[in-house]
């Protein structure tokens, strides 16, 4: 599955939105990938996550003990990808603004892959890596359905992206006039 195949799934689901969006990262963009419109369809989710699992396996990372998803956005793709990798899925969630592994006991030395939905700046993955390191868990790679940065985001580890789709993103004080003229909407989930 290549980038065009992935974007075709997003288009079928009506998940490529145009307007003025405040991304989870705080950056502004004329395009928003509303993955919830994809993930509400089990068949589309399975297709994408199976392909992502195959790409992870092809990366020859050695044994993987768990898949870790950052809540909220990474929950569905991490679970579905773990199903295809045939390993357990766990997640981190924010507690006082910091990712914590609250509901699971993952042994020290376990080898994990972090699976995220969309990467823009890589912050959620970096924060998940910090959490794993604090617990003595080895992050062997991160993976995502779409890398909006087209490989430019620093995620702190090897990033395996099913698709790279570079979309412009701007700081709020550096918007092009045509974007600034459109009222901004904030559809992300970081502060939930």
Swiss-Prot record:
Instruction: Give the cofactors, semicolon-separated.
Output: Mg(2+)
Where 5-phospho-alpha-D-ribose 1-diphosphate binds, per the record, is at 116-124
Entry binding sites for orotate: 120, 148
What biological-process GO terms show up in the record?
'de novo' UMP biosynthetic process; pyrimidine nucleobase biosynthetic process
Enzyme Commission no: 2.4.2.10
Question: Per its UniProt record, what InterPro entries does this chain match?
Answer: OPRT, Orotate_PRibTrfase_bac, PRibTrfase_dom, PRTase-like
Q: Which UniProt keywords apply?
A: Glycosyltransferase, Magnesium, Pyrimidine biosynthesis, Transferase
Note the superkingdom of the native organism: Bacteria
Q: Which Pfam families match?
A: Pribosyltran
- Gene Ontology molecular functions: magnesium ion binding; orotate phosphoribosyltransferase activity
Instruction: Give the pathway listed in the UniProt entry for this protein.
Output: Pyrimidine metabolism; UMP biosynthesis via de novo pathway; UMP from orotate: step 1/2
The reaction(s) annotated as catalysed by this protein in its Swiss-Prot or TrEMBL entry are: orotidine 5'-phosphate + diphosphate = orotate + 5-phospho-alpha-D-ribose 1-diphosphate
Q: What class of enzyme is it?
A: transferase
Family to which this protein belongs:
Belongs to the purine/pyrimidine phosphoribosyltransferase family. PyrE subfamily.
Assembly mode: Homodimer.
The entry's function note states: Catalyzes the transfer of a ribosyl phosphate group from 5-phosphoribose 1-diphosphate to orotate, leading to the formation of orotidine monophosphate (OMP).
NCBIfam families, per the entry:
pyrE_Therm
What's the protein here called? Orotate phosphoribosyltransferase
Query: Which species does this protein come from?
Result: Brucella anthropi (strain ATCC 49188 / DSM 6882 / CCUG 24695 / JCM 21032 / LMG 3331 / NBRC 15819 / NCTC 12168 / Alc 37) (Ochrobactrum anthropi)
